Amino acid sequence: MTATITITNPILSGMNPDPSWIWDDEFQRIVLVTSTFELVPGLPIYVSEDMTCWKHVSNVIDADLARRLLIPFVDDSGGVYAPTLRRIHGKYVIACTIARLDDRRAMEGGCTESELMRFHAAEGNFILEADSIEGPWRGPFWIEGAEGIDPDIFEDGDGNVYWTQTRPAVNPQWEGQTEVWTQRINPETWTFVDDGLPAGSGK
């Protein structure tokens, strides 16, 4: 018979919004990441074997990666929103969005036009990847053609990888309508493979 345990909430106290977690089968543990907005270091990684005892093992974003993500140039309460953590083709992968970038501050702070173009072509959506949760983390890989916020990344049984997120509806039937869309993505180049398809429109 499987032993039962008692979980006392909150399992993580303090500011830990938008949690995303995986069961890391290789190491028989839960790995969890949360939002940190404009704070650096950012995207803390926690691990647990039993859902009750948690250990903070690393932060994904250091000062150098924060600069590459343009975090110093976001407005208050901007920055990294709603990370999604997955194992994709054996790598640890985080899909996320940078919100509320101030272009003027970015340019004044030394950001190049090409950096801003890549950022806006991806609407602030990016991938980070690593071979270990302790890092180092590679990226950002800006996802050109991504639309919206709150991305998810998924690998199916055949090894195909899909990017899914919410965006304003292409043909809205009411003000503020959104839709979920999905598109296959190449996990080696982090570029889209084919045309995206709406998966749902909130009807």
Describe these PLM feature segments:
Residues 1-203:
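Carbohydrate-active catalytic/glycan-binding domains of CAZyme proteins
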